[in-house]
Amino acid sequence: MVRPRRYGSFHVYDEIKSGFHTRKAILSLIPKTRIDSDTGRFHTRGPMPVSVYIQSVAYFLLAAVALFASAGTVAIATYWVYLAIFAAVFIVSFLWLDPDLARERIRPGGKQPPITLQLISAVLVSHWIIAGLDHGRFHWTDTVPPWLQWLSLLALAASYALCLWAMHVRFFSSVIRIQNDRGQVVITTGPYAYIRHPGYLAGTLVMLASGLALDSWLATAFLTICTLPFLFYRAVAEDRVLLTQLPGYRDYAARVRWRLLPGLW
């Protein structure tokens, strides 16, 4: 007798007498359903929460207003490229990432560090305002060479790409917790084959490159000082949680020694 197993709103048969069809073949006929190559689990994509679209558009508009209003002009080419990178990141996120990830990131709970993500958002907005005032009005430290501004924009795009890659291959939560509801396991593919916390490496590079891309040494210093200690603290705290609570992570950490920077840390 063939027993159905229910995943999401579908019944999938583990065995079929003819032997011709496989579970993967059946799932290929179901839209927005995939097999996780690492865990063997089935994921059925639902719609992206509307609140995620609203938050993303609001965040983009906030960045644009903070930059151009503080600068007093919209005639800054690098600022438009900066915002275009933002827009591209949002679009790729909507098309590529699991909507369950978005639901997790906007859901309260977990073990938040002392410095909350809301405070980090406030710091980001503040550094946009500082950069705009510096470059567009007061010219305190707007002496970043043009080649370094464009190089920083490339670094920014690469950093966001690394972050999206990490989020795609492993469920990337905004809180520190073991995700038992998703059957969390150790992932050793993608960027996790080389460093244990590629998402934090991407975040570090974003914080270093953002102010430079906006032509402000002052904004760069402000953002770096305010955020890098938080990112390093969070990487260490998450490592401790995973070492004690996630089966197999200790062996993985022994194989992949580096948290963020291969050869350094």
Describe each PLM feature range.
Residues M1-P4, G8, V12, A102-R103:
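Short intrinsically disordered, low-complexity coil segments enriched in acidic
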Residues K17, H21, L29-T189, L201-W265:
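Membrane-anchoring alpha-helices and their flanking helix-loop junctions
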Residues V2, V12-E15, A25, D36-D38:
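Acidic, Ala/Val/Gly-enriched low-complexity intrinsically disordered segments
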Residues A193-L201:
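Histidine-centered phosphotransfer motif of kinases
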